[in-house]
């Protein structure tokens, strides 16, 4: 399961993400954060952390460096 999620996230980074303008307010980017979180915490907890990270990636939050 973990490898399937990681393949999807890497596919997103390589093929889908370049179609949108770069707008992530954090370093590392949200998709890189998701990959790191899934590798560190497993699929369920990693995706939950990534979900809340994406919710924070908006003009109301300052952004900055945020590692999982």
Swiss-Prot record:
Chief place where the protein resides: membrane
Topology in the lipid bilayer: Peripheral membrane protein
Sequence intervals crossing the membrane: none
Annotated S-S bridges: none
Keyword field: Cell inner membrane, Cell membrane, Membrane
Cellular localisation: Cell inner membrane
Domain of life: Bacteria
GO cellular component: a single term: plasma membrane
Function: Could be involved in insertion of integral membrane proteins into the membrane.
PANTHER family in the cross-refs: MEMBRANE PROTEIN INSERTION EFFICIENCY FACTOR-RELATED
Family: Belongs to the UPF0161 family.
Name of the protein in its database record: Putative membrane protein insertion efficiency factor
Annotated source species: Aquifex aeolicus (strain VF5)
């Amino acid at each position: 399961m973990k490898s399937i999620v990681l393949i999807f996230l890497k596919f997103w980074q390589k093929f889908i993400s370049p179609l949108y303008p770069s707008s992530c307010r954090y370093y590392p980017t949200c998709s890189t954060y998701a990959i790191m979180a899934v590798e560190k915490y497993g699929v369920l907890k990693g995706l939950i952390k990534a979900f809340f990270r994406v919710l924070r990636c908006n003009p109301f939050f300052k952004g900055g460096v945020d590692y999982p």
